[in-house]
Amino acid sequence: MQRARLAYVPAQPTAAENAGIIPMSLRTVHFVMPGGVDDPAAPSGGNAYDRRVCLDLPGFGWQVTRHAAPGTWPHPDRAARDGLARTLRDLPDDAVVLLDGLVACGVPEIVVPEAERLRLAVLVHLPLGDETGLDAAVAADLDTRERAVLRAVPAVIATSDWAVRRLVSHHGLAPDRVHVAAPGADIAPLAAGTDGVSRLLCVAAVTPRKGQHRLVEALAAVRDLPWTCECVGGLGHDPGYVAHLRTLIDQYGLADRLRLTGPRSGADLDATYAAADLMVLTSYAETYGMAVTEALARGIPVLATDVGGLPEAVGRAPDGGMPGILVPPEDPAALAAELRGWFGEPDVRRRLKAAARGRRAALDGWATTARSLAGVLQRLPEAPRSAA
């Protein structure tokens, strides 16, 4: 379970934007995050989010002290568990602590006792049991562990309104303790594309949850069309799935048109987006979908599965236009049909591109994310309490 360096200027809000949040001096929040958060070979939306808010929170009154927690979260070995326990134990009483849920939610025996003396908030990028391909017993155990952690802390932060609703209903949390801080987006130059239609792009780690096999099946059904596709994302999370995907690509005879490039970052990733005509995302589960807003920030339309928080990420242009198409999950035929429509109907392309440019202008920046997080941290109770 589980991107690359982002080029941007950290948020510098005015006092008026920040009314009621900025104190006379910076307060400290201790941010406990996965040990691989800076690893360019293992990019993820969660890692990118964590890194970005570390740089933007000071603009909203919070100095961030980072604590990397090495380990195979949410299934840590003894050394990782001991390391996390030591990190939390060494923090002073009443310290404000933001915990990445990938680290925190699987180890209630470590986190819950610390909620008695620390002011804890847990940032949930993806509910642990929602990872695709888990054994039912493993998913149930992770679910139970996560529930114990989230019920013990005074604040839970999710990355979409959909995720807030899911956490409240699934774990029986008090709605006033679950907050949204959706990822922001950096507006980038409009993508020139390739020819306006044929270059497809999927930016996602190659894992069962991202469902690239469904993309392969859909592309095989429209092999008569002149498309090329790049799947950009880490290949090290699930080598077995990557091998299966390569076999599938070869079986369909698509190897010369569909490439698994591995992760890209910086100028290479920017160039990849600049050449794209359509973003395609075939996930089984997403709490938001940062790759979608990264595409829309460049005016690239989106074709994605209608799951989780993806509809929020796609959103609408100010005039109500949809900058993307949402298809039912588990339906490669519907995906193929929409691809055929994209290629065959110029009016569809024009409409989607116009809406994508409108949505681009309306996207919230990362300052909105940092402001939301700062507000949650500011409101953490002075004395930790047990939360039901």
Give the residues covered by each predicted segment.
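Aromatic "clamp/platform" in nucleotide-sugar-dependent glycosyltransferases that forms part
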Residues: 284
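Short hydrophobic beta-strand element within catalytic cores of glycosyltransferases
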Residues: 301-304, 308
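Conserved donor-binding/catalytic core segment of Leloir-type glycosyltransferases
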Residues: 157, 191-210, 216-221, 230
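Carbohydrate-associated surface elements
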Residues: 162, 184
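Membrane-proximal helix-turn-helix segments that form the acceptor-binding/catalytic region
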Residues: 137-156
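Short alpha-helical donor nucleotide-sugar binding micro-motif in glycosyltransferases
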Residues: 263-264, 271-276
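Nucleotide-activated donor-binding/catalytic signature segment of Leloir-type glycosyltransferases, i.e.
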Residues: 242-264
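Conserved acidic donor-binding segment of nucleotide-sugar-dependent glycosyltransferases
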Residues: 316-332, 341-346
